């Protein structure tokens, strides 16, 4: 039986071989970028046009990256790269959204809590402690997947919305807007 006569799934064709070749190429490119600190060099290069601030809204830290994260992340990578090529200095700092319902729902489900009274009975302080402990269970996966998308972002110096300094900066910003009667 010739290759053309085989069922499509068992044929050896260029797309099957190409995937393996592409995977090898991906690994080589990522290794080259890492060994030569290419991302870091973009941050160190001369920026005659000054700073360009790019606000990158962080993903929730409670799950694995999905298509929506990858798509949004690609868009969020293009703009800072473009501005860097135009001569701006653009910090690209990763962030983690650690607040709100996603983490609360996750902990409630894990602990079998269904109502506010259940949480109070369990103990709010203990509930919050469990939430903080579980927030970064997927961090390793994110740190592996995001660079594989080709995105250049500083994940080692990430900000976390649950950190006091971050929360205080949000309150400070809100106060500035309030005093200017913008909110």
Positions of predicted regions on the chain:
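N-terminal, positively charged nucleic-acid-binding surface of large information/translation enzymes
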Residues: 2-183
């Amino acid at each position: 039986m010739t290759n053309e006569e085989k069922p499509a799934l068992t044929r050896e064709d260029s797309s099957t071989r190409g995937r393996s070749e592409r995977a090898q190429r991906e690994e080589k490119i990522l290794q080259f970028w890492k060994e030569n600190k290419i991302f870091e060099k973009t941050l160190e290069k001369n920026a005659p046009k000054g700073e360009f601030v790019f606000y990158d809204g962080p993903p929730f830290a409670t799950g694995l990256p999905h298509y929506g994260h990858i798509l949004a992340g690609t868009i969020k990578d293009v703009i800072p790269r473009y501005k860097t090529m135009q001569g701006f200095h653009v910090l690209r700092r990763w962030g983690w959204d650690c607040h709100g319902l996603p983490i609360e729902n996750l902990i409630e489900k894990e602990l079998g809590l269904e109502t506010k009274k259940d949480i109070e009975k369990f103990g709010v302080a203990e509930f919050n402690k469990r939430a903080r402990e579980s927030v970064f269970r997927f961090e390793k996966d994110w740190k592996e997947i995001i660079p594989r998308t080709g995105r250049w972002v500083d994940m080692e110096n990430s900000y976390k919305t649950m950190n006091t300094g971050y929360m205080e900066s949000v309150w400070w910003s809100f106060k500035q807007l309030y005093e200017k009667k913008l909110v």
